[in-house]
Design a protein with these regions (language model features):
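Auxiliary Fe-S-binding modules of radical SAM enzymes
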Residues: 1-59, 90, 94, 124-135, ...
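Local cysteine-cluster metal-coordination motifs and their immediate loop/turn environment
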Residues: 40-52, 63-78
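Active-site mouth loops of central-metabolism enzymes
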Residues: 62, 73-86, 139-148, 208-215, ...
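Active-site beta-loop-alpha junctions enriched in small/polar residues
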Residues: 77, 109-111, 141-145, 169-171, ...
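Conserved alpha-helical substructure of the radical SAM core
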Residues: 78-105
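Non-cysteine beta-strand/loop elements that form the S-adenosyl-L-methionine
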Residues: 101-107, 158-172, 229-239
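Conserved glycine-rich "GG(E/T)P / GGGxP" loop and the immediately following alpha-helix
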Residues: 104-124, 212-217
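Active-site-adjacent beta->alpha loops and helix N-cap segments on the catalytic face
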Residues: 113-124, 148, 174, 179-188
């Protein structure tokens, strides 16, 4: 019996991103290397790396560059995690100062090996940046901490970040294949709890599209996020990092993203960033400013 495989969808022109280049890019790469830091820009093979680094913006990834989970979409290295480096927050703060940042974004790998999921280092990093650069805003993109409310309390109190982000990533039906080890309801609960802890802090979440989800499912997730008091939404195209990762089912057109952005605004999100190359920290400072005007 002859089995015919479905053809791989051709990559459309709207997903072309410029290759990393320029003085700012080279200077930032040297700085990250010298301070022994990691960025999700590099580790997750972000298509916007060149644009963002030339704008002197980057998303720092703390707690090492080895993740304890094996999500089917993610390019970050998987395996046994590294020891926690308690000097890392100070080095992140130094990098932010040398880059002249007024808005810093910090994320991490999953650290299911630690009781608090790494929340303590998020707290230390937030405090280190603010101490070194008074007035610098700090957004954090956190894992689900395996549903541990005490971990979220560590991140949000006593002084909350300027934005708390936790991505739901996809629709519930696809969780088993896309987010192994995660649960949709748990992510919603952590977003709701973060907002309860600091009602004035914008809460943010995002999804990747193109993994086989239906538009009706995406709209339902958006409604769920609003019901759990999420303020900022990001929607972007899933891009397959390698042949070992989940295949792209389809490319979502810019017009479809525009329609979802309008739907999100109608639902009451303070800001919706939607487009093929959008990632959770893409133009994060603009998203914060738009959300806090409401």
């Amino acid at each position: 019996m002859l089995v015919t495989l479905a053809p791989k969808p051709a990559r459309p022109d709207w997903l072309r991103a410029p290759a990393p280049a320029g003085n700012n890019y080279r200077e930032l790469k040297e700085l990250i290397t010298r301070l022994k830091l990691h960025t999700v820009c590099e580790s997750a093979a972000c298509p916007n790396l060149g644009e963002c680094w030339n704008r002197r913006t980057a998303t720092f990834m703390i707690l090492g560059n080895v993740c304890t989970r094996r999500c089917g979409f993610c390019a970050v290295q998987k395996g046994g995690p590294l020891a926690v480096d308690y000097d890392e927050p100070a080095r992140v703060a130094e990098a932010c100062e040398l880059m002249g940042l007024r808005y810093a974004v910090v994320t991490s790998v999953n650290r299911d090996d630690r009781k608090d999921g790494g929340a303590e280092l998020f707290r230390l990093t937030i405090d280190a940046i603010r101490e070194r650069i008074p007035g610098c805003k700090v957004e954090v993109l956190v894992p689900d901490f395996q549903g541990c409310h005490a971990a979220m309390e560590t991140v949000m109190q006593p002084n909350a970040p300027d934005v708390l982000n936790h991505n739901t990533e996809t629709v519930p039906r696809l969780y088993r294949q896309v987010r192994l080890g995660a649960r949709y309801e748990r992510s919603l609960d952590m977003l709701r709890f973060a907002k309860e802890l600091s009602p004035a802090t914008p809460v943010k979440s995002g999804l990747m599209l193109g993994l086989g989800e239906l538009e009706s499912e995406v709209l339902q997730v958006m409604r769920d996020l609003r019901e759990h008091r999420v303020d900022i939404l990001t929607l972007g195209q899933y891009l397959r990092p390698s042949a070992r990762h989940l295949p792209i089912v389809r490319y979502v057109s810019p017009q479809e993203f525009l329609g979802l952005r309008e739907a999100g605004r109608a639902m009451g999100f303070s800001h919706v960033e939607a487009g093929p190359l959008v990632r959770s920290s893409y133009h994060a400072d603009d998203s914060h400013d738009a959300a806090t005007k409401h």
